[in-house]
Amino acid sequence: FRGEALPSIASVSKVTVVTRRNGDDFGTRYVVDNGNELDFGEMGAPLGTSVTVENLFERIPARKKFLSKELTEENAITNLISRFILANNKVSFKYTVNDKIVFNSLGEGTKSAIETVYGRDYLSNMIEIHSTMSDIVLQGFVNKPSFSKHSKAFQTLIVNGRYVLNDDISYTVYGCYQKYLMTRQYPTYVLYLDLPYDFVDVN
């Protein structure tokens, strides 16, 4: 969570964070309910961090009514988690919805992350690329021309470790594939762009 995101969520829900670092004998558990600290202390815990959010906007009905249907919100969260897995492919993620495991990544690199998110068939239809120009490195996977999709949902761009949406990159890749695509088809890719930090505005 970046900046004030986690405390903002904790101010309108019940949040439980359990974390243990490598080398620590015990983990730490922190529970906040609508901004009020309920519990803070040591506990036995596996390595890593889990964040549980419950009763979002339960005490603010005016905000809660603006939430979309449960499935819509779930799909939006699942989409974001999938991008986190791809962006941080050396970190393992376990994502569950209603006690059902949706993603369980191994943290074993790009190919493993792609297979976790999209499946083995997807990975087998991708072409690995790598290009370096001065201080700029572009690498990742693009689809074989025969493996296009009917939406842009399978396009992922990671810039300096962050998932970003960029229409210019999407349009450029589309231009390269256009002559191979049927109507309303789009290329699919997982691209990692690393460049000097002063080249981009993280906001």
Regions found by a protein language model. Give the residues of each.
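N-terminal phosphate-binding caps/lids of nucleotide- and nucleic-acid-binding domains
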Residues: 1-203
